[in-house]
């Protein structure tokens, strides 16, 4: 499979030519997606997952889920900790609750992992995550294509960004025989993965890059910069030298995408998704069974009412944490503001009803 950048395709899409390695016959020509070159079926699944096939507007849905999933997971654990009975009680509700709690503990690590890795390539929070990683020196190093200068950084989420993930095709004329020389130089320098990406220089004063793109375990993402005229290796990066957080990001993203451990990884993702659906439905069922039967006996309980019941210090801390999270995770901030507005309107309406009933008495 040989993939080429094509400016007529959508972002992150490439044209793939399938060639028989024995007789060099062309067996196929189709559009693939991302650095790994996934085929149309998985591409459709990916678009459904990231944006519901609605483009940038649809990406708000997945970012909303990633922004709140870790809150729901940790909030559920906190709720269980403060409301768990001191002694084991065997009744229908407690048995249902026990199933929900056990399943929640089992899925907790996955919910935190997928929330964190999903946010790293999200449309709005992703930029803030990148700034944090840059400040903490957690970015992935990239080979320098000039004879002097600083190392650049690599984007682990190139497949989900708004640019092409394949080779850059410069406008200047090129000698196709240079591919063999550059590849040979890279092989001699230790680039031995079966899946490679060769990026041509955009300008004459830049080197070509050869990058391993095998994200399955063990990860092979070493890269070299090669002078296409002298075939000398100018710079290289090795995965074993990456900062720990850069390695964890690489592994986390690849696990999230079902690449790291192949079929086993994908089956685990399917099982996690189904179990998460069961957890959510089970939680709503418990809430439905315990919902107030009569509004007169159980008056409206709103977030505003609970917030007012806190101490002044508690209110201040709650507001501060909410503002900081809203700035770091913009989609969470906007959705929280809308929720608080609706809750406030509901609280005001309930307050008016209570005052009216008191006046009537």
Task: Pin down the residues of each PLM region.
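Extended, hydrophilic extramembrane loops/domains of integral membrane proteins
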Residues: 7-48, 190-197, 207-257, 261, ...
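Short, intrinsically disordered terminal tails adjacent to the first/last structured region
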Residues: 355-361
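Membrane-interface anchor segments at the N-terminal boundary of transmembrane helices
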Residues: 261-272
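Short, amphipathic, aromatic/basic-enriched membrane-interface segments that mark the entry/exit
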Residues: 35-39, 297-310
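Internal alpha-helical transmembrane segments
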Residues: 44-139, 270, 281, 287-288, ...
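Hydrophobic alpha-helical bundles that form the membrane domains of multi-pass transporters
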Residues: 1-3
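Membrane-proximal low-complexity regions enriched in glycine and acidic/polar residues
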Residues: 129-246
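Solvent-exposed, acidic/flexible segments
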Residues: 34, 38, 54, 109, ...
């Amino acid at each position: 499979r040989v993939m080429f950048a094509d400016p007529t395709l959508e972002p992150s899409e490439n044209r793939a030519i399938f060639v028989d390695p024995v007789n060099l016959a062309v067996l196929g020509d189709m559009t693939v997606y991302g650095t790994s070159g996934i085929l149309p079926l998985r591409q459709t699944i990916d678009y459904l997952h990231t944006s519901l096939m609605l483009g940038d507007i649809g990406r708000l849905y997945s970012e909303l889920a990633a922004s709140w999933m870790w809150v729901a997971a940790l909030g559920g654990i906190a709720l269980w900790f403060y409301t768990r009975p001191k002694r084991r009680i065997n009744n229908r509700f407690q048995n249902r609750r026990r199933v929900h709690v056990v399943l929640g503990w089992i899925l907790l690590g996955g919910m935190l992992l997928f929330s964190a890795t999903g946010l790293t390539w999200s449309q709005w929070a992703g930029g803030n995550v990148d700034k944090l990683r840059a400040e903490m020196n957690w970015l992935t190093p990239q080979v320098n294509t000039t004879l002097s200068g600083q190392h650049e950084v690599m984007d682990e989420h190139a497949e989900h960004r708004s640019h092409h993930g394949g080779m850059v095709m410069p406008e200047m004329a090129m000698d196709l025989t240079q591919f063999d020389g550059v590849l040979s130089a890279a092989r001699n320098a230790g680039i031995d993965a079966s899946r490679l990406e060769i990026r041509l220089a955009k300008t004459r004063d830049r080197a070509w890059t050869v990058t391993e793109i095998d994200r399955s375990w063990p990860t092979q993402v070493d890269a070299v910069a090669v002078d296409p005229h002298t075939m000398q290796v100018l710079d290289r990066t090795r995965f074993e030298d990456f900062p720990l957080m850069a390695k964890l990001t690489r592994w986390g993203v690849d696990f999230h995408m079902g690449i790291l451990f192949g079929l086993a990884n994908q089956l685990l993702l399917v099982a996690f998704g189904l179990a998460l659906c069961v957890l959510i439905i089970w939680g709503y069922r418990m809430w439905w069974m315990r919902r107030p039967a009569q509004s007169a006996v159980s008056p409206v309980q709103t977030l505003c009412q609970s917030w007012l019941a806190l101490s002044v210090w508690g209110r201040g801390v709650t507001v501060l944490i909410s503002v900081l999270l809203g700035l770091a995770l913009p989609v969470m901030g906007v959705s929280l503001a809308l929720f608080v507005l609706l809750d406030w309107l509901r609280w005001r309406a309930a307050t008016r009803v209570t005052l009216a009933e008191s006046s009537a008495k």
